[in-house]
Structure formats: structure tokens, C-alpha cells
Amino acid sequence: IEKAELGGVCLNWGCIPTKALLKSAQAYNYALHAANYGFEIEGTVKADIAKVVERSRGVSAKMSKGVEFLLKKNKITLIKGEATLCENKVVNVTNVDDSTVTKYTADHIILAVGSRPNSLPFAPIDGEKIISYRQALVPDKLPKSLAVIGSGAIGSEFAFFYRSMGVETVYLIEYLDRILPLEDDDVCAQISRSFRKAGIKVMTSAQVQNVDTTGENCKLTVQTKKGVEEIE
């Protein structure tokens, strides 16, 4: 039973589309520095963010269709709808197309519902100035500046992608004392050096206390070891 795309968050709104974006960013940087590899490119290399996003979404869509094919091949019935547990071994499924409700029974019911982004108390997601990973995956234009709160795998990927695509100022803000805190120390140190070399403003041991969205740009109040900093 699935109400959205097959493959869940990872395939449609996580690991796969971000890797597609990063591949485009890598190709863009190769083109910008083609001379370093012995090539000459006539004219100016420009990034078309709409086409970059289109490619990323296409990669996810193709893989999602592949999952659907495998389900059919293995004789697994796909039900497009939203399920509600109603009693022992019974679920009611509301069809996504016509809202009809159908009851299904099963000896065992597995809950594999995925996840969704959670807003910070002082920075509710509005989809415009404060965005979640979903909006970050499908930008219609590149911002002049960007602050990424949290430097786990997802946050670090977005910081690198947007900076690689030409965003002038990118902050990567981490509460703990290093970025990618779940990775090995030597890996974190190397990636941190690479990010700083790429122009990403890495802030560790930093806590965002407030986000002011009333002006043209967001203003963040960040508590660091050196004191309170205001960034924009």
C-alpha cells in the first residue's frame, strides 16, 4: 500500500536525487576547470538549474518505475492509497484517485511509512525562505546566499551542491564540534578542509537561536564559542 511514489523517501526525495544533483555539480565544475584536464571550451559555461533539477527528477522517476516493474514481476499487488489501522489485522485504505475506502485483512501488517521533515520551533518551514529537503531538491532558481542548519549527510550534500553551482555564500552550521558527526574523525576532517577550500563557511559548535524572516533575507542569530554572531 503506497500513496505516493514507489521507493519511498530515499529513492524519490533523498539519496538518489541528491546524488544526481551532485553529479551535475561535478560535471559543471569539470567544465569550469576544463583547462586543468587539457581541454578548451569555447564560450561561457552556464548552469541551467531547471535542467539540472529535471535530470535529477528523471533519474528518480526511472528508478521508481523499475521498482513497480519488479513488484509486478514478483506478483506483488500494489494498492495506491493511504492506509489506516482500524482493528486487529484490518486496515482501511482510502484510494488516492477517487477517495473510495476499501477494507483489507492480513495476518501480519508491516508499518514502513518513511519520514517527513520537522520544523525547528523558531524556524517553521514556509517553503519559501525556510525550506526543507524537498524544496531544496527542486529549486526554480539559485539563491545568492544559503544557510544549512545541520551537517549530517543531507545537510552536507546540499551545502556542497549549492556552493558548487555558484551560490555566493553558503553557511553549514553544526551544533556539535565537527561536521558529519556520525562519520570517522579523519573523514570529517578531510571533508571539512575540502568544504572550506570550496568556499563553504563551516560553523561548528554553533547553535542557531533565532531566524528572522521579516526582511528581504533571513537573518540568523547563532551562538558560537566566540559569542553571538548574526549572519544573513
List PLM regions with ranges:
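N-terminal Rossmann-fold NAD(P) dinucleotide-binding loop
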Residues: 155-156
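Gly/Ala-rich phosphate-binding loop of Rossmann-like dinucleotide-binding domains
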Residues: 159, 163-164
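Conserved NAD(P)+-binding/catalytic subdomain of aldehyde/semialdehyde dehydrogenases
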Residues: 232
